Amino acid sequence: MAENRASAYTEGVPCWVDAQLPDIEAGKRFYGELFGWTFEDIDDLDDTESETVRARLDDEPVAALVRKTDGRMPTVWTVYFHTPDAGALADRIRAGGGQLVTGPRRAGGRGVTALAADPQGAVFGLWQPAGHPGFGRRHEPGGFAWAELYTRDTEAANAFYGDLFHEALFGPGADPDFGRAPVSDVFPAEMPPHFLVHFQVADCEAALGTVARLGGRVRVPPFETSYGGVAVVSDDQGASFALLQG
């Protein structure tokens, strides 16, 4: 269901996504045409932040594109989970066997962010909002729809994230937008554990044609999941994401 002003989140619900890209202008062309996004510069970046643009759908924020400053870093989409206290959540991540990759650190007046890795190495973000609560729209074509963790050990993943985000995953009325599945269900068994960000599309086959025309690639052709029909693609710079028919 389409949702506007999606700003009230339980801790552990995905509230934002960004793509680390070597070429932001190319990213704007690709995603602007694929999803109908428009873009605006973020003008309160601090000295530690790379050039960043915010993507909008019908004038509401839906994602960000961030320029990579180190070519050794992956070109990747990252999902951020809402938290009211990034420092406390970072402590719980470490106590559960995960690691902090960066932060927590303040991101201008927008909030506090951090990057973490779970015990199997899958990287995810934390977002403690201030001026920027997260998605303004989701669950509609062109917006965030789901995040799937592909992992080698689903029982261990369920235990780790269940301890971190119990209310979001298992509490009354839980609607987490976040699932777990074995890597080998979709990808080669040797692929590292990772989160796959899903964007909703009205017509998956048409979207796949647009991806190919824009220089992207189909990584996994359409298949059925418990949450809908999915195809895995990558943009023209190599960042992978999924299209979810809805």
Predicted regions and their residues:
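Vicinal oxygen chelate
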Residues: M1-Y9, V13-P22, T52-A55, K68-R92, G96-L149, G171-P182, V186-F187, ...
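Core segments of cupin and vicinal oxygen chelate
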Residues: A2-E60, A95, G103-G111, L149-G179, ...
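Conserved short beta-strand elements that form part of the metal-binding/catalytic scaffold
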Residues: E3, W37-P74, P119, V123-A130, ...
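Residues in flexible loops and secondary-structure boundaries
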Residues: G27, D43, D47, M73, ...
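Short alpha-helical basic/polar micro-motif
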Residues: R29, D91, P119
